[in-house]
Amino acid sequence: MSDAAIADALAARGFALAPEFLRPDEVAALRGVALQRRATGEFHAARIGRGAGARRDPALRGDEICWLDEASAPERALLARFEALREALNRALFLGLTALEAHYACYGAGTGYARHLDRFRDDDTRAISLVLYLNEAWRAGDGGELRLFASEDAREPALVIAPRGGTLVALRSDTIAHEVLPARRERWSIAAWLRRRSDADALR
């Protein structure tokens, strides 16, 4: 799926699915970097909330994370690709996206992430969320699906996505609720957010 098609899907439905956003060799390279960084102790348990109120709650969120940087060639290439997508979305949708942040996420067997929105109630800067999967040979029985809901109150998912390597999911951070179902094996991904200036900053 082209960047233009991702923009069209976001405008029409609030989410987009790009099954072959990265090639298998690119996925393998990023997974290798993630495994190496985890082996050197760079991952830590994720928290929910932000600031002083952030807390660890494995019943709600069970992943370990590590923020991407530009120390390796695979990470630099991916961040450049995300930057190109950010620019394309700005051209097509006039979103005013100004920044990007991204981290690896590793869910152990039996862990998931309860239904939530990515935009914090007291921080409106997250505009578009991205999820890129790094798993190899993911099978139907492995679980770990991402379920997207068209609104915060929707009862049934609009889309259920298997976390197959190379697949990219883009969604609106403010309206598309989502959850990660528990997996039966380790589940690897990269989560990223395209950010804009806050409404409060824009009024200054």
Segments and roles (model prediction):
Residues 1-129, 133-168, 174-204:
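Fe(II)/2-oxoglutarate oxygenase catalytic core
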